[in-house]
Amino acid sequence: MSAIQAAWPSGTECIAKYNFHGTAEQDLPFCKGDVLTIVAVTKDPNWYKAKNKVGREGIIPANYVQKREGVKAGTKLSLMPWFHGKITREQAERLLCPPETGLFLVRESTNYPGDYTLCVSCDGKVEHYRIMYHASKLSIDEEVYFENLMQLVEHYTSDADGLCTRLIKPKVMEGTVAAQDEFFRSGWALNMKDLKLLQTIGKGEFGDVMLGDYRGNKVAVKCIKNDATAQAFLAEASVMTQLRHSNLVQLLGVIVEEKSGLYIVTEYMAKGSLVDYLRSRGRSVLGGDCLLKFSLDVCEAMEYLEGNNFVHRDLAARNVLVSEDNVAKVSDFGLTKEASSTQDTGKLPVKWTAPEALREKKFSTKSDVWSFGILLWEIYSFGRVPYPRIPLKDVVPRVEKGYKMDAPDGCPPAVYEVMKNCWHLDAATRPSFLQLREQLERIKTHELHL
């Protein structure tokens, strides 16, 4: 290990670059691709004490492993499979053949160094749109500005907004899927040879969720075909590389296969979504202590996101999963972004989303707190859909006039007070997740003494 490299602290995750059989009794053997966790630095900086997935500890050589890093979404061109770099106008037109309306790529501008060009196939022709770079922002029409190319492409994928067509299908750069390099560099790329796909456990709009086996461990695998939605899932995986908490579903790694698509591999949550878990068991099986534990599990995950300046934006019982040992973990980070960013509100679940987020696209930890209040209501109603007997179109007008749902049957008054505190129309008066956790822990302590 180089003398200038700082020692890795305890808890650092590493991925093995080579096989290590060990030469002494205290060594920890491992195979290329294994994930190891640093336990302590040794006196010799070239060696660490580490543990493997099953908790066995031993000494490992530092130069055989690579530290896992968080992938920063939105800053790396390598996460954009439609970006082709320095190619000419003529090369772009050849790549967009045979013609297919909505097929597109982005290249560096040959006429305007520093700018980009969006090339789009439409009605048998290829249109070239200059993307101007000015004052650290990007724009095609000098009306709408974007922080980066990903945001720009995301916008025109959902709306043509003056272009000849909406962007439908990216022309993936030949020979490589750029994201692969980035996940490999940061230690999150897994090998397809080590993954067995067993059975479909869920179907979504963008692909399937499958039960898999990765090196003898059960895993869940999101399988996404390479299309215009792949970028959103790469962004989700990028967010997950930056987050680590016992109540967040853990990313194990990413596989990018040019022909077969994108695979996001996470820990397997045997008991499925919290909403289904609650509905299938109900009041006769689940006691108040169990409901309070699930509430605290989710609250602790959200307190962690709050502390790391992430906003989930889609918190609901359907996006919380339950493990074999009944631990609730927050999942589905598809909309999760750093707290400063905004978002199109077209696809947001109205009944779970804070009024200011629907009205003004103002997302913050406090809008997540509103959603947490709805999730608490779901937990204590054993998975009922919120705002029962109110037509969807009437929910927002009634909420904005101050309407709050009644307490679910049998819900402790103290828990209902927590829900109502989450539903203040003034976001600033809602509690933080730290305060919510403290309130729920006080309720738990009080119940233990009853």
From Swiss-Prot:
ATP binds at residues 201-209, 222. The modification Phosphoserine is found at residue 364. The active site is at residue 314. Residues 82-171 form the SH2 domain. Homodimer (via SH3-domain). Interacts with PTPN22. Interacts with phosphorylated SIT1, PAG1, LIME1 and TGFB1I1; these interactions serve to recruit CSK to the membrane where it can phosphorylate and inhibit Src-family kinases. Interacts with SRCIN1. Interacts with RHOH. Interacts (via SH2 domain) with SCIMP; this interaction is dependent on phosphorylation of a specific tyrosine on SCIMP. Interacts (via SH2 domain) with PRAG1 (when phosphorylated); this interaction prevents translocation of CSK from the cytoplasm to the membrane leading to increased activity of CSK. Interacts with LRRK1. Pfam families: PK_Tyr_Ser-Thr, SH2, SH3_1. It is found in: Cytoplasm; Cell membrane. GO terms for molecular function: ATP binding; identical protein binding; metal ion binding; non-membrane spanning protein tyrosine kinase activity; protein kinase A catalytic subunit binding. The architecture of this protein is similar to that of Src-family kinases (SFKs) with one N-terminal SH3 domain, one SH2 domain, and a C-terminal kinase domain. Keywords: Acetylation, Adaptive immunity, ATP-binding, Cell membrane, Cytoplasm, Immunity, Kinase, Magnesium, Manganese, Membrane, Metal-binding, Nucleotide-binding, Phosphoprotein, SH2 domain, SH3 domain, Transferase, Tyrosine-protein kinase. It comes from Bos taurus (Bovine). It is an enzyme of class 2 (transferase). Belongs to the protein kinase superfamily. Tyr protein kinase family. CSK subfamily. Residues 195-449 form the Protein kinase domain. Its EC number is 2.7.10.2. The modification N-acetylserine is found at residue 2. Non-receptor tyrosine-protein kinase that plays an important role in the regulation of cell growth, differentiation, migration and immune response. Phosphorylates tyrosine residues located in the C-terminal tails of Src-family kinases (SFKs) including LCK, SRC, HCK, FYN, LYN, CSK or YES1. Upon tail phosphorylation, Src-family members engage in intramolecular interactions between the phosphotyrosine tail and the SH2 domain that result in an inactive conformation. The gene is CSK. Its main location: cytoplasm. InterPro entries: Csk-like_SH2, Kinase-like_dom_sf, Non-receptor_tyrosine_kinases, Prot_kinase_dom, Protein_kinase_ATP_BS, Ser-Thr/Tyr_kinase_cat_dom, SH2, SH2_dom_sf. GO terms for cellular component: cell-cell junction; cytoplasm; plasma membrane. This is Tyrosine-protein kinase CSK. PROSITE patterns: PROTEIN_KINASE_ATP (PS00107), PROTEIN_KINASE_DOM (PS50011), PROTEIN_KINASE_TYR (PS00109), SH2 (PS50001), SH3 (PS50002). Residues 9-70 form the SH3 domain. It catalyses: L-tyrosyl-[protein] + ATP = O-phospho-L-tyrosyl-[protein] + ADP + H(+). The modification Phosphotyrosine is found at residues 304, 416.
